[in-house]
Amino acid sequence: MASVSAETPASHGHSFSKKTFHKPTYCHSCTDMLWGLIQQGYICEVCNFVVHDRCLKAVVSPCSSIAASLIKNPVAHCWSEQVHRKRKFCNVCRKRLDDNLSVHCEICEYFVHVECQDFAVADCKENATYLPGKDLSAVKHTHHWREGNLPSNSKCALCKKSCFSTECLSGFRCEWCGITLHAYCYKNIPQECTFGNLEPIYLPPHAVSIPRTEVPMEAIIGVQVRRKEVLAREYSCHNIGEQFDFAESEQNGAAGRLAEALRRLSLVLPRSCHGNCHASPPYVRARSISEEFNTDARYRDNGEPVQGTAHGRDPRSPKEKEEKERGDEEMIKVYDGNNSLRRRIFRVISVPRQATTEQVLTSALRAFHITKDPTDFYLTDLYASDETELCDPTPILNLNRKEGKRPAVFLRFKNKDSGEVRVYPGKLQISESFCIVPVTEATTVADSINEALEKFGLQNFNCDDYRCSEILLDRGVTERVLSWDERPWDIVKQLGKDSIRQMELMRFYLQLKQDPHGPNLALFVGNLPPNLSERSYENMLTEFLGKENRFSSIGPIYYEYGSMVIIYEDSNKAVRALYALRESKYEDKHLLVMLLPSIEPSMVPAGVQPLLVFVNVKSGGCQGLQLISSFRKLLNPYQVFDLDNGGPLPGLYVFRHIKDYKILVCGGDGTIGWVLQCLDNVGQDSECSSPACAIVPLGTGNDLARVLCWGSGYTGDEDPLNLLRDVIDAEEIILDRWTVVFHTEEKEQTQVVCNAAGAGSTSEDNTQIYVMNNYFGIGVDADLCLDFHNAREENPNKFKSRLRNKGVYVTMGLRKMVKRKPCKDLHREIRLEVDGKVVELPQVEGIIILNILSWGSGANPWGADTKEDQFYTPNHWDGMLEVVGVTGVIHLGQIQSGLRTAMRIAQGGHIKIHTYSDLPVQVDGEPWIQSPGDIVVLKSALKATMLKKSKIKRRNTEPSILPSNGEGGKSTDE
């Protein structure tokens, strides 16, 4: 095959060669089929990019071997769990994911095989780019392009033709605004991005800052897939002697690096960890063999692999491999340094037995995606006694061999006295991606900073205001701040001995010493005991942290929820506190700790109302995980919060300084009540005390969502993009809210409250106060609700389907029909007053007080208005409540089926009920048994601003984020 790399533009980095394809193959540039019998097109020998002869000079996709070097600000991906995925392509090797395990980024549309994960490019969306002192008018946001895996309805924004392909990885999509393009139209589109249709609710990255710490992004935003056993494995530590060869460390002068590694490890890992980290970056524990290069190797008792696979997986059958080894080609294991040998991690290359040293070296470099000059490297025989260098004329035949083992070689970096290093400007306002700085063994970091500042045109700035970091792009992004007297060339050479691949992925990063986030780092701490004093909370945290990790100040304390915010001015101390508190327990329950981002409100453009998204992943049908993943891709992930991590309070704290924003609550009626209750508690401390709230109904009943036209329940077929567009178009309305006061007669009797989310405040005179949004029930309705609640509490895993939940309700109702009726003659057990007048009750087994005209999953107990009706037409903002009665379980079923309505009893704005015995009650679906006493329902001073969905019909013509099943979604209005 003839190489054509010299004939094509070098900017893309591909190594193209002519190839004859024996099955239908498609061009990755124009997506047309390659026609012909032999040598139909070209293929990159590294990343498998296929291209027509006519498209060769129009290639814009960089090869995966150089893609990492093109990134100015690397951002690590947040990887999902390993799954089998259909109709997707790997962004590294460009092959289908169908038959192999793969992972994808939870923030962007980046998909890779598990075997290709080491070569994944750390180019996730940069979601926090705030720079102090930069004016909003000077901010220009650019597109963030992702190649391939486009939605099926994608059309090119330039030529308006379809740019979707099922045959290959092709086309581009902006991760911010969602526009899609052909590869050949990619260069002709303006680079400035305005976030597309979602601009009115998008939290712009230039308004967000996160502390400059080593805490991974997934730990900040609360990605669910990396918790429990995964986190336990990542932060577990073993014997440090297993990973360090101390004799070698002393010989190489690495004792200082070992001490630095241990010091840094104490900053990142919990106190319970006592062990190993690398002698070179990244300074975390050594990854296991299965985690490193994923060679799919099998091991004998002595630990030697029987076989390995090259990058991209070898599709040949065992028989074909055996025939090839007997033929003219040799399979050779390649280790890229001492670390790979120590962990027995290798790559396999296939070369002709008569290959020259140059050919073998080229194949070895290509296997590890090394793009540096081949003359800087050499190969040595692993099994030779003195590690002999390979030389012509027959290097393969001269290799030493061991019985039962393949020949193996070391890929080594030549020991030079001088060289060049790349210095990247990071977030400095520089147009160049990097500069080349010549270094020698005597060059220090301070010298390199001065040289880099001069090349970037910043020679007039003070060198002392800057720092230089060592950045590794191996399986994420790892940073180590360098001291001024360290020598960059020594770092490069030491890294070359340990791992050529790590040396290739290492870069020096110039940045200001001052953290753009500012001196204050906020930690949210939850799962503390509720209703303690500030001094008690302070003493408790000091005991957990110790005096050395004590916080600088205390932020808001949410006494009712047992949560608070603590402030640090030292980032290292904050990280130590984060992990120390995560290891701490109170009453056998781990504390919940989150490092919170910060939002600069002055950087939010006028007319933009950022959307704060809350998702309850445990609600009703449990579609929350799918939704939260889609919203993190469509929006800034720092505006999307999982209610399983601290509830609504962390998100409300982060948004407290924004003057105008909206809220989207994804959950059931109980979740909406939870968010509104938290808003009541923090509203007085926020710039926006009553943000408008929209709903994605995930619960079983979803009565408030029905009234506000958000639907009966999210099914998973709706396009998340259309849900967000509905929020933008929704109209604001006012929802009346009501205070329900319970005062029991027997002070010594304990009240049972079943759900903390609906818990009201309790005073010393045995009075409890709740806020009602939807309805309040006494009698048979509440009794049925209580039975369902108790069953779900006993076994929550059985109540993950909305349909099953409704089936359980029906089953329990049928049982109530044949059992003793606990609420019989309810009209004799209570006295009802409406607006100061006693109302005579008919013979009922339950009464329901309605604020909205939806109850029990969409039923309307009040019914339609008639001309001779003595009552006013009700709505949810008129300051009136409707009181209806039900005669039994059969009547409840008839109401839910639409055959009957409830008995209209009264209508008013102030209701008082006196109960003479223990009765089941429920407020907004949260039930318990209430002792005898007085119940007063009065209008609350707290009103909620809600968003009502506008009935707009849309055509499903815009590309969308695909659900996890890989299939396109439908419009919400279809």
Where do the protein language model's features map onto the residues?
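Short amphipathic alpha-helical segments embedded in low-complexity Lys/Glu-rich regions
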Residues: 42-49, 60-69, 103-111, 121-130, ...
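Cys/His-rich zinc-coordinating "finger" modules and their low-complexity flanking regions
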Residues: 1-319, 328-338, 345-347, 530, ...
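Surface-exposed beta-strand-to-loop junctions
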Residues: 3-11, 68-73, 133-139, 333-343, ...
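Catalytic core of DAGKc-family lipid kinases
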Residues: 607, 612-629, 634-661, 671-854
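Intrinsically disordered, proline/Ser/Thr-rich N-terminal regulatory segments
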Residues: 207, 215-450, 454-517
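ATP/nucleoside-binding phosphotransfer catalytic cores, i.e., glycine-rich phosphate-binding loops
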Residues: 237, 241, 247, 579, ...
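ATP/NTP phosphate-donor binding region
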Residues: 153, 157, 203, 207, ...
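Beta-strand elements of modular eukaryotic interaction domains
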Residues: 6, 16-18, 31-35, 41-43, ...
